[in-house]
């Protein structure tokens, strides 16, 4: 009897540094929320959108934490951007805590020619927002703490004004399909769950209501549909390191309510961003972190069996819609022949290998053309 051996080789972004095991995400959206452990939201009656709508279609982490002992907010936002808090353990404004370094994600994106923006709720957009106004606070906006992003605390800096924009502009950018590849979103102090505000006077419900209103705008956009990814997380646990929430919604995610118990931190998020965009070197503790690749759908080959004439049926899952996949076969793991070239509009496809009837051993792999 002929025996099938399946070998999977995932050739993902082979020309880009640090690609890891991640699919080719085109556009990233990040929503940063405030000061709640995951149990405040998971299964809670005040978070009906998260539990009833988001989680059933998402992947999420059950063991995601802020870095050990790192509090309050500002150090965690800095960590998400740079993999370190630069020794900062307070929430002071950039006038005190600004950093003269290019060792952070936005600078790497700039150097690589990769577009990015941060959308901050309650800013005016006429100046770089270096101090608090309305429900906006700088400590929830890591970019204003880096001199190369603000011209060293210059409220009129052109680079800062171009990249740090009022949140309402996101809707128009989504509609016109002109969003950047990396989009960092900070709601105001009511909508992010930091404060209890009227009329709900319930921080968890406020956040859930805001997400219910705003997330659909992202998920119905062309940028999201074209291999986009939305990450929703929190800065820190209130009174603890967590676990806090990390939710991924993406056409490329495992989805369907998948969750894992892998220990991850903000360093994992940063490493994942560096892998997605192929920028280096590793920033701070990202060098030591496990990435979030398990939340994405893995490439896999399986066989439901043979046809009546002895051919092998192959099911390939975890492919990226809209890209070309080459299924190759070998009898010796040295010489590989393409047996199928497939462009799939979904995350899976099936083929039949009629050549398998001629061999005692047959190995398979899938190559993806980026």
Outline where the language-model segments fall.
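N-terminal pro-sequences and low-complexity stem/linker regions of secreted or lumenal proteins
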Residues: 19-300
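Short, composition-biased motifs enriched in small/polar/acidic residues
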Residues: 298-370
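Short, threonine-centered small-residue motifs that mark membrane-proximal processing/anchoring sites
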Residues: 17-19, 327
